[in-house]
């Protein structure tokens, strides 16, 4: 008689995705980040749910309610610290996951990749509206600056901004709707994650060699379930260490001050994981141009599959493009640094050079390097 996990209508879906799934035998630790992102999402959903039970989305009481959570709610300080720092770990895993996709050519699974980019945008939106909720100085001014970017939309821009605000400035209506969005979006992310997996399982996983691995597949359980559990343990150890020993390390000191529309903080900047995009936005001395650059800094990922010129899939045996890949990583780090410093010389020019390099790598240098390597191997 067949096992229940293979016959039950619901269990057989889980079985084909998590137990009997044929996986390449040689996928490395870089393939752990997908499941780590799943763990991050579950952690954020649970901690967020418990925070929402005590939070009030009203400008008079929002800041106080967060203080109340940290002081008076049983383990509220821990739940809040896990949630705030969990977002940082979510983005660390996201960037590692995207970097893995770029390095090993996983973007050639175009549907899976594009849904992944949409997921990335959704998580960024969720994070942004969540950052506004504590209603500190950086929450308020961050919301003001970023929503104001919508005013660059031709003709309807100003109306669009007021529509998002629910009034003539960032006010109570804005906070209330942002809380509603922050509660809703993670479930949308969860739904898109299911689609992401659905499309991935149509093709099967890629692997470090970039060649077809059908001849050498192993079951996901127990091999990769245990491998993933090790990743879970390492990440949770890092998250709890950060949440317990240095919970405010990655936050902004300005957010300990309640929002004040009269006083602007000296440097308005987003959370560290958005600084690279913020640097690209600031590097163009034109509002519309900056907004478009900001948008395309993420959407450029969608064109990567169509600019793949190499006859090989990954970068495992492509030293020239490997070098460019690590230049991209260094460039992202430079942009992250520039996004967090004041707009003055020499930071302005460094940011502009780093921004030009960022787009050049994706749109020009990677495709050129692929063609060069084909020529060197006489594969043209």
Swiss-Prot record:
Q: How is the cofactor bound?
A: Binds 2 heme b groups non-covalently.
Protein name, entry field: Cytochrome b
Q: Which Pfam families match?
A: Cytochrom_B_C, Cytochrome_B
Q: Which residues bind heme b b562?
A: 83, 182
Q: What is the lineage of its organism?
A: Eukaryota, Metazoa, Chordata, Craniata, Vertebrata
Q: What is the protein's known function?
A: Component of the ubiquinol-cytochrome c reductase complex (complex III or cytochrome b-c1 complex) that is part of the mitochondrial respiratory chain. The b-c1 complex mediates electron transfer from ubiquinol to cytochrome c. Contributes to the generation of a proton gradient across the mitochondrial membrane that is then used for ATP synthesis.
**Which GO terms are recorded in the biological process aspect for this UniProt protein?**
mitochondrial electron transport, ubiquinol to cytochrome c
Which Gene Ontology cellular-component terms appear in the entry? mitochondrial inner membrane; respiratory chain complex III
